């Protein structure tokens, strides 16, 4: 029995960011595609309409930038690993090389949750 689009979306809503990240990687490998290729293309219409559409689209995607690890570097590395699918070395390199993006092009809710988790671990974070 095939799942409907609504059923798939309901399943995705119940997944964590890490699970979704792992799913995307598996999907990319299985079908030999990249998530970047699926990004919507903005077609320039009228000057006012195109500018309004771009401004609205920018509000939907946010980047979580780690600007500093603070005193609790190990805790920050643990949170980075929870938010991403990075290994220990990669997460440590990301934390050591601040400022670096932890999450890119995520919705407002996910960006706020990630920023709050990182701040709770003692990191300094920007959401752009």
From Swiss-Prot:
GO terms for cellular component: cytosolic large ribosomal subunit. GO terms for molecular function: mRNA binding; structural constituent of ribosome. It holds the Pfam family Ribosomal_L12_N. Keywords: Ribonucleoprotein, Ribosomal protein. GO terms for biological process: translation. Forms part of the ribosomal stalk which helps the ribosome interact with GTP-bound translation factors. Is thus essential for accurate translation. Belongs to the bacterial ribosomal protein bL12 family. Homodimer. Part of the ribosomal stalk of the 50S ribosomal subunit. Forms a multimeric L10(L12)X complex, where L10 forms an elongated spine to which 2 to 4 L12 dimers bind in a sequential fashion. Binds GTP-bound translation factors. This is Large ribosomal subunit protein bL12. It comes from Streptomyces antibioticus.
């Amino acid at each position: 029995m095939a799942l409907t689009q609504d059923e798939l979306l309901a399943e995705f809503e119940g997944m964590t960011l890490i699970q979704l990240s792992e799913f995307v990687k598996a999907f990319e490998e299985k079908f030999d595609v990249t998530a970047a290729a699926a990004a919507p293309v903005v077609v320039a219409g009228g000057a006012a309409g195109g500018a309004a559409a771009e401004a609205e689209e920018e509000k939907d995607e946010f980047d979580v930038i780690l600007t500093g690890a603070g005193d609790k570097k190990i805790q920050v590395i643990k949170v980075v690993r929870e938010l991403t699918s990075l290994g220990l070395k990669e997460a440590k390199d990301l934390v050591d090389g601040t400022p670096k993006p932890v999450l890119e092009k995520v919705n407002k809710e996910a960006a706020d949750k990630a920023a709050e988790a990182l701040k709770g671990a003692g990191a300094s974070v920007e959401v752009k």
